[in-house]
């Protein structure tokens, strides 16, 4: 019972603390992040997800011994790239 009451008080305290220390205009920060993400989706060259590593081996090529990660494009090496 005491533990439950302490947990409730702790949660209420932490909730109040986040509201007290919150940035007054945090919605502007979120809006700027949204606009930046929108700009990157419109400009595909700016997106870092579109970068392709052409130095990897295609499936079926010999890659060596057991590895996870490069040099295989899939990331799996079991003597041949999977």
UniProtKB/Swiss-Prot annotation:
What the entry lists under PROSITE patterns is as follows: OMEGA_CONOTOXIN (PS60004)
GO function term, MF aspect, one: ion channel inhibitor activity
**Cleavable signal peptide:** 1-22
Q: Which residues form the propeptide?
A: 23-52
Task: List the expressing tissues.
Answer: Expressed by the venom duct.
Question: What cellular component terms from Gene Ontology apply here?
Answer: extracellular region; host cell presynaptic membrane
| One matching Pfam family | Conotoxin
Q: What is the top-level taxon of the source organism?
A: Eukaryota
For domains, the record's comment is: The presence of a 'disulfide through disulfide knot' structurally defines this protein as a knottin. The cysteine framework is VI/VII (C-C-CC-C-C).
User: What protein name applies here?
Assistant: Omega-conotoxin-like MaIr137
Give the classification, highest ranks.
Eukaryota, Metazoa, Spiralia, Lophotrochozoa, Mollusca
């Amino acid at each position: 019972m005491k533990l439950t009451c302490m947990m409730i008080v702790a949660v209420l305290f932490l909730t109040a603390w986040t509201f007290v220390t919150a940035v007054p205009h945090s919605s502007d920060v979120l809006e700027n992040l949204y606009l930046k993400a929108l700009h990157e989706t419109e400009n595909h060259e700016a997106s870092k997800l579109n970068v392709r590593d052409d130095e990897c081996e295609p499936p079926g090529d010999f890659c060596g011994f057991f590895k996870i990660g490069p040099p295989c494009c899939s990331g799996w090496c079991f003597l041949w790239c999977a």
